[in-house]
Regions:
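Alpha-helical transmembrane segments of multi-pass small-molecule/ion transporters
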Residues: 1-313
């Protein structure tokens, strides 16, 4: 357990380093709101699609394709989304419901979830986690686009407009484009893959610096209760329900452990990028990311300990 706890800290500490760097750079006026807006757009349209494309390109789709696991994960994700949105309707002002919902169901599986899966289960964790990550990207971005479109002042919410928003989402386009390359094991020219890696490697630091640049004590106080509520749903409520459902479904061992890690991951940095693109309450999105990442160091270890104590993983 100490090794898992230290692994979690090794993953979350760099995240907070980038967040606090963003706070510092904004405080000393080395970055401003214009930079944050432009950089967030760059991440959403260019660097994050490159990261997702390369991540799927390198996944072994043949080795870890488990239909039952994928079906359960898809159903549990849809149920989590519905529960989070339903709770937001009763809990939030209308203009914040999309941001609240996205923060409560969208996990950082591509970074923290996958890293912990690899730490616990080695190559098997990487291959199975990568397959789930591909499904996650498609579901999370589609559902996030839908819920943000319903409440966004700049995104139309009629069915055709929502469909267009989903289809034209750069993150979804990158996932769909990468799938045949991964399935048929088609490589990219060396120079092109290296160039893509350069872009991909800027994604997380740049996104986190932008998040840190938006943080302020006033913003945290303003969105404190909503951010805390969404964070509790994300880190305690939904992971408990989803993991219990997986246990009842019959999953044990590595499959149950990886499902827990994915459902228990903190809110993804991409939620801030999409919130800003939709002209939503990005300060609330940033606060949820910070709170859930803090909570993850505790909830992940407690959950793993409990599952190991019960002999289920």
């Amino acid at each position: 357990m100490l090794a898992i706890f230290l692994e979690t800290l090794n993953i979350t500490a760099p995240v907070f380093a980038m967040l606090f760097l963003g706070v510092l750079l904004k405080r000393i006026d080395w970055i401003n709101d214009n930079f944050i807006h432009t950089a967030s757009s760059l991440v959403f349209n260019v660097t994050m699609p490159a990261l997702l494309f390369l991540g799927i390109l390198h996944a072994d789709l043949h080795a870890a394709l488990q239909p039952a696991l994928l079906i359960y994960f898809a159903l549990a994700t849809l149920a989590s989304f519905a529960l989070a949105w339903g709770w937001a309707i009763f809990r939030c002002p209308r203009e914040d419901r999309g941001i609240y919902t996205q923060g409560a169901f969208r996990g950082n599986n591509g970074v923290i979830g996958l890293a912990l899966a690899a730490s616990m289960y080695g190559d098997y964790g990487i291959s199975l986690g990568a397959i789930l990550a591909a499904l996650v990207i498609l579901f999370y971005n589609t559902l996030s686009t839908i819920v943000l479109a319903v409440y966004s002042p700049v995104i139309k919410s009629d069915p055709w407009s929502i469909c267009k928003s989903v289809i034209s989402n750069p993150l979804i386009i990158s996932v769909i484009a990468a799938a045949p390359f991964a399935w048929f094991k088609i490589g990219l020219p060396g120079w092109l893959e290296t160039s893509g890696q350069y872009l991909a490697q800027t994604t997380l630091p740049l996104a986190l610096i932008c998040i840190g640049g938006t943080l302020s004590l006033a913003a945290l106080r303003k969105s404190g209760s909503l951010a805390l509520s969404s964070s509790l749903v994300k880190m305690i409520g939904l992971p408990v329900l989803a993991t219990l459902g997986a246990w009842l479904w019959g999953f044990r061992g590595a499959e149950l452990g990886i499902l827990f890690l994915y459902f228990g991951s903190p809110t993804a940095a991409a939620s801030f990028v999409m919130a800003r693109a939709a002209q939503g309450n990005h300060e609330l999105a940033a606060a949820i990311i910070v709170l859930t990442t803090l909570m993850a160091a505790i909830t992940t270890n407690v959950g793993i300990f409990f599952l190991q104590w019960g002999g289920w993983i």
